Amino acid sequence: MYETLFWQFAKIWAVLIPLFLAVAYFTYVERRVIGHMQDRRGPNRVGPRGLLQPIADALKLLFKEITIPTYASRTLFLIAPAMAIMPALAAWAVIPFDDGLVVADINAGLLYILAMTSLGVYGLIIAGWASNSKYALLGTLRASAQVVSYEIAMGFALVGVLIAAGTMNLSGIVHAQAGPFWEWFWLPLLPLFLIYWISGVAETNRAPFDIAEGESEIVAGFHVEYSGMAFAVFFLAEYANMLLISFLAATLFLGGWHSPFEGLPVLGPAFDWVPGIVWLFAKAAFFAFCYLWFRATFPRYRYDQLMRLGWKVLIPGTVVWLVVLTGLVYGGVGPWF
């Protein structure tokens, strides 16, 4: 029993430690990429080419005081960051990095992911309410409405993946996409793929859907009263969720660890030496780059535009395509057999 527990803890930390490092350096990459897009250098002073900047930022936040507003609900104010970060980390337990390389290979993996992504908003709601600030409360109201709206669209998009793969096990979904890149789910499920990606960006409160923070409108939204490591935990949760949505997109629609040349006569054997985890990381890196690209490119949606997009475009679009997809699957049409 103790060996089993030790092995489980080892697997958990084998995922969490690289994840924390990835989040830290994702912030560095974001500042460098957006800097180049805006024709400036970005961080380049701390360490060679600024590579130690994330460590400097972490130390700065570590030594800052966590100030609690006078009229805030102290207990809830301190609990909220933990409630935001825990679902963001727990969701990684079912992500398969390669064949058999997963912390918990459960059959209800897709349902588990939906549950974890839904729970994260409670941290935002409690943070805004406990701060006793009108700006934080406005950010909380926006965040809750946004997550409810886009969680439905994302859930319907993932139902399409379930219909196509015939399983909720994430490893099983990846196995169902075995073959070259045109046999992955991105092509037959293209409308659902696009809706999933738009909903994923909205769920993580990133530009152009960052109305919950809205610096130009409500100062900084739900975490306006937070400082020090309490603020850093919210920051960590946001970037962990961004990476999670990117890895999920690669897993559910782009074949996971499968090579894009798998099964091809010449290119297939030529790329057989590349480990599956490298392909997965490369696909996820593309989606992570898109987050940065969107932030540097698109203006923020107005609140009414965001709600209209979710309720009048994405949700009806997923319902229509699910009806079409069900007919195709039952009719034996498509690459699902």
From Swiss-Prot:
GO cellular component terms, A-Z: plasma membrane
Transmembrane annotation, as ranges: 9-29, 77-97, 110-130, 154-174, 181-201, 229-249, 274-294, 313-333
Primary role: NDH-1 shuttles electrons from NADH, via FMN and iron-sulfur (Fe-S) centers, to quinones in the respiratory chain. The immediate electron acceptor for the enzyme in this species is believed to be ubiquinone. Couples the redox reaction to proton translocation (for every two electrons transferred, four hydrogen ions are translocated across the cytoplasmic membrane), and thus conserves the redox energy in a proton gradient. This subunit may bind ubiquinone.
Subcellular location per the Swiss-Prot or TrEMBL entry: Cell inner membrane
EC category: translocase
Origin species: Halorhodospira halophila (strain DSM 244 / SL1)
EC annotation from Swiss-Prot or TrEMBL: 7.1.1.-
Gene Ontology molecular-function annotations: NADH dehydrogenase activity; oxidoreductase activity, acting on NAD(P)H, quinone or similar compound as acceptor; quinone binding
Tree of life domain: Bacteria
PROSITE patterns to which the protein is assigned, alphabetical: COMPLEX1_ND1_1 (PS00667), COMPLEX1_ND1_2 (PS00668)
Family: Belongs to the complex I subunit 1 family.
Pfam families: NADHdh (PF00146)
Main location: membrane
Membrane topology: Multi-pass membrane protein
InterPro entries with a match to the protein in the record: NADH_UbQ_OxRdtase_su1/FPO, NADH_UbQ_OxRdtase_su1_CS
Keywords of the record: Cell inner membrane, Cell membrane, Membrane, NAD, Quinone, Translocase, Transmembrane, Transmembrane helix, Ubiquinone
Reaction catalyzed: a quinone + NADH + 5 H(+)(in) = a quinol + NAD(+) + 4 H(+)(out)
GO BP: any one term: aerobic respiration
Subunit and interaction comment: NDH-1 is composed of 14 different subunits. Subunits NuoA, H, J, K, L, M, N constitute the membrane sector of the complex.
Protein name (database record): NADH-quinone oxidoreductase subunit H
